[in-house]
Amino acid sequence: MAAVAARAGGLLRLGAAGAERRRRGLRCAALVQGFLQPAVDDASQKRRVAHFTFQPDPESLQYGQTQKMNLFQSITSALDNSLAKDPTAVIFGEDVAFGGVFRCTVGLRDKYGKDRVFNTPLCEQGIVGFGIGIAVTGATAIAEIQFADYIFPAFDQIVNEAAKYRYRSGDLFNCGSLTIRAPWGCVGHGALYHSQSPEAFFAHCPGIKVVIPRSPFQAKGLLLSCIEDKNPCIFFEPKILYRAAVEQVPVEPYKIPLSQAEVIQEGSDVTLVAWGTQVHVIREVASMAQEKLGVSCEVIDLRTIVPWDVDTVCKSVIKTGRLLISHEAPLTGGFASEISSTVQEECFLNLEAPISRVCGYDTPFPHIFEPFYIPDKWKCYDALRKMINY
């Protein structure tokens, strides 16, 4: 009887594991199809995708020859540069060897071999723990979590191990050469398990850096900075931009400084702050405000969430007197709250209106109701108009 029970228990565990594999398997094919076929607007390469229009930055010739790349290709280029430069660098994660769900590691195993680009079991805590061990030996570990939504099983490894390793050893040991990549944010039809923006969970953890790019050019430069940084870094990649965002990207390696926000557009009346995909939303809002209200907006891409660039944001708010912050994550406890609190403390006497946060709702991320959930340009514009009329 005990043998039958044990066998039944084993079958149940196998069944549960199979269900989990099938559930997670839904991440693959569905999410790289459909909406990720953007329509080209004109020769400027502006692209309308879902709730935003991607706006490429002017081509930079500062770093030599450039090539047209989408965001996932720029990630591949950065990883290629790192593997070529650093013989200790390794890349690993679920399905990484064949190129990854979003093709960010395509061709790298063939070029650098199975000992440097390889698959892992479906176990996020194991992936990060393995990466910590590699980094502690002095090698460069580049771990991939297949979706940011599934980074939570690795939360203990990141928060209690990676982030504290240097401190608890009195700087005798560290895992600063660990970088964790993860596709992030809304995707058009990802629903509650493939759309989350969990950056705020890690913002409360001293010892790690959190970075989110808005474009292919930014992604390559920021990722290379993360890989070479002496602290563990989490690099969230807006997956809706993987194919939708296309611009000229330098072929050779280059770095963009971490913890340094970028003022994309200067203005005098309102400061707009965002990161990742949402930057393109607020850029549209800035254009709408100028056209409809005659309001001049200063647009800031935060880029690094932790440690964030307080000086750039506060300097802008002192000038404009108004601040709107927007992100896809839920409102309560979102990183906009931290920015708002800091600006309130530093710039209180300069504020002309209450700080506005335009964010996702305090609900699980919905499927068919995603268009109502996301903080689109109309929600941001309405909040901006209320600030101006305050």
UniProtKB/Swiss-Prot annotation:
Keywords: Acetylation, Lipid metabolism, Metal-binding, Mitochondrion, Oxidoreductase, Potassium, Transit peptide
Binding site for K(+): G176, L178, T179, C226, D229, N231
Enzyme Commission number: 1.2.4.4
Binding positions (thiamine diphosphate): Y150
Enzyme class: oxidoreductase
Any GO BP: lipid metabolic process
Reaction catalysed by this enzyme: N(6)-[(R)-lipoyl]-L-lysyl-[protein] + 3-methyl-2-oxobutanoate + H(+) = N(6)-[(R)-S(8)-2-methylpropanoyldihydrolipoyl]-L-lysyl-[protein] + CO2
N6-acetyllysine carried by residues: K230, K239
Transit peptide start and end: 1-48
A GO CC term attached to the entry: mitochondrion
SUPFAM superfamilies documented for this protein: Thiamin diphosphate-binding fold (THDP-binding), TK C-terminal domain-like
InterPro entries, per the entry: THDP-binding (IPR029061), Transketo_C/PFOR_II (IPR009014), Transketolase-like_Pyr-bd (IPR005475), Transketolase_C (IPR033248)
Function noted in UniProt: Together with BCKDHA forms the heterotetrameric E1 subunit of the mitochondrial branched-chain alpha-ketoacid dehydrogenase (BCKD) complex. The BCKD complex catalyzes the multi-step oxidative decarboxylation of alpha-ketoacids derived from the branched-chain amino-acids valine, leucine and isoleucine producing CO2 and acyl-CoA which is subsequently utilized to produce energy. The E1 subunit catalyzes the first step with the decarboxylation of the alpha-ketoacid forming an enzyme-product intermediate.
Known partners and oligomeric status: Heterotetramer of 2 alpha/BCKDHA and 2 beta chains/BCKDHB that forms the branched-chain alpha-keto acid decarboxylase (E1) component of the BCKD complex. The branched-chain alpha-ketoacid dehydrogenase is a large complex composed of three major building blocks E1, E2 and E3. It is organized around E2, a 24-meric cubic core composed of DBT, to which are associated 6 to 12 copies of E1, and approximately 6 copies of the dehydrogenase E3, a DLD dimer.
UniProt xrefs under PANTHER family: 2-OXOISOVALERATE DEHYDROGENASE SUBUNIT BETA, MITOCHONDRIAL (PTHR42980:SF1), 2-OXOISOVALERATE DEHYDROGENASE SUBUNIT BETA-RELATED (PTHR42980)
Protein name: 2-oxoisovalerate dehydrogenase subunit beta, mitochondrial
Origin species: Rattus norvegicus
Gene field: Bckdhb
